[in-house]
Amino acid sequence: MQRRIMGIETEFGVTCTFHGHRRLSPDEVARYLFRRVVSWGRSSNVFLQNGARLYLDVGSHPEYATAECDSLIQLINHDRAGELVLEDLLVDAEQRLSDEGIGGDIYLFKNNTDSAGNSYGCHENYLVVRAGEFSRISDVLLPFLVTRQLICGAGKVLQTPKAATFCLSQRAEHIWEGVSSATTRSRPIINTRDEPHADAEKYRRLHVIVGDSNMSEMTTLLKVGSAALVLEMIEAGVVFRDFALDNPIRAIREASHDPTGRRPVRLAGGRQASALDIQREYHARAVEHMTNRRPDPEMDMVVDLWGRMLDAVERDDFSKVDTEVDWVIKRKLFQRYQDKYSMELSDPKIAQLDLAFHDIKRGRGVFDVLSRKGLVTRATTDEAIATAVNEPPQTTRAKLRGDFISAAQKAGRDFTVDWVHLKLNDQAQRTVLCKDPFRSVDERVDRLIASM
């Protein structure tokens, strides 16, 4: 499948610093964030005019799920649009707090761990063809996903009793299974809960919950693009070397603790391979595969950055990727800071910097400051992201949902939507079932909108 439906769900960390004596719990702060949403949507779980879903997840984490996208840049635009939507809620909530005499600064972090060691996720969704055994996909995909953090981890400082160490991934410490149907209880790498939000006879939805939330657009491009390409190769029957892991959970932690990519991980049957070896194999197959598929400038960018990143790891020279890959950008920032102020990695100021890197408020968040200084390579533009805040992707089912929501809100009509249903809550209770996520035009939806 060369045109694939993809989406990203991001949970955001919330904290608030108060100016006066009055204090609020994270739950209460999250409710302030969603007060405006509840006022028009009558719920803290809503779909927006751009086709996305916005809701308050368990544990007071706001979650933004992008609409269905069928290209990488489109997906990046809609993922970044989520940051703007949340930032808008943040500004509104701070004003409400101020109006009620509770002075405070709200912080929203696009990261995966808080100071108490809790983890929240960034989930990727890929539509895959149902043909063949699911185990074929998971067998090839698992070693790739376990080692993918080498090319697209967000990076973090891990405080251990002995010392602080720089790790590749924020999420790796919190993954407890390889393949499972649960997401919160056991945190697997691939989630098999089969809710395709499409024709279940044709498709399944692959739910990957192992990835880090990325700040860099280029890192998101690489994270999602490389996974989509591996899925495409699996569907095309490309043969890969067997890298079945002896213990995926131990391997994911070992890989995270090794920015050199050279430490061997145990494979099934007692063999060994490093994260770099494993990624090299998948990249080599991707380079080969690109010569046999239709041209795609986005995928060319993915394969190029993937190769440059592996070269950088191998040579221990990151100068050609240090504006593109999150963990490299972050580590360089820490090193500059340590050199300038003669401090250890374990210094609390580094931990603060680690957190501030993921602050989504423009002008305050460290990543945004780096971006404004031209120290970060972009994959898209501010204009395209701003457009995605209000407009759904024009090439997928999201357009039907977004257009329906816009029309119903304009007409003041009561409605209910989910990923596949559009319903007018009138006497007739007219409902349209949209099973095909690739379809952006539907006469039934046009008739429903016209009837308003």
From Swiss-Prot:
One of its GO terms (molecular function) is ATP binding. Keywords: ATP-binding, Ligase, Magnesium, Metal-binding, Nucleotide-binding, Ubl conjugation pathway. It catalyses: ATP + [prokaryotic ubiquitin-like protein]-L-glutamate + [protein]-L-lysine = ADP + phosphate + N(6)-([prokaryotic ubiquitin-like protein]-gamma-L-glutamyl)-[protein]-L-lysine. ATP binds at residues 53, 66, 419. The active site is at 57 (proton acceptor). Mg(2+) binds at residues 9, 55, 63. GO terms for biological process: modification-dependent protein catabolic process; proteasomal protein catabolic process; protein pupylation. Its EC number is 6.3.1.19. It comes from the Bacteria. It holds the Pfam family Pup_ligase. The keyword DNA-binding does not apply. Pathway: Protein degradation; proteasomal Pup-dependent pathway; Protein modification; protein pupylation. PANTHER family: PUP DEAMIDASE/DEPUPYLASE, PUP--PROTEIN LIGASE. Belongs to the Pup ligase/Pup deamidase family. Pup-conjugating enzyme subfamily. The reaction mechanism probably proceeds via the activation of Pup by phosphorylation of its C-terminal glutamate, which is then subject to nucleophilic attack by the substrate lysine, resulting in an isopeptide bond and the release of phosphate as a good leaving group. Catalyzes the covalent attachment of the prokaryotic ubiquitin-like protein modifier Pup to the proteasomal substrate proteins, thereby targeting them for proteasomal degradation. This tagging system is termed pupylation. The ligation reaction involves the side-chain carboxylate of the C-terminal glutamate of Pup and the side-chain amino group of a substrate lysine. This is Pup--protein ligase. It comes from Gordonia bronchialis (strain ATCC 25592 / DSM 43247 / BCRC 13721 / JCM 3198 / KCTC 3076 / NBRC 16047 / NCTC 10667) (Rhodococcus bronchialis). The lineage of its organism: Bacteria, Bacillati, Actinomycetota, Actinomycetes, Mycobacteriales.
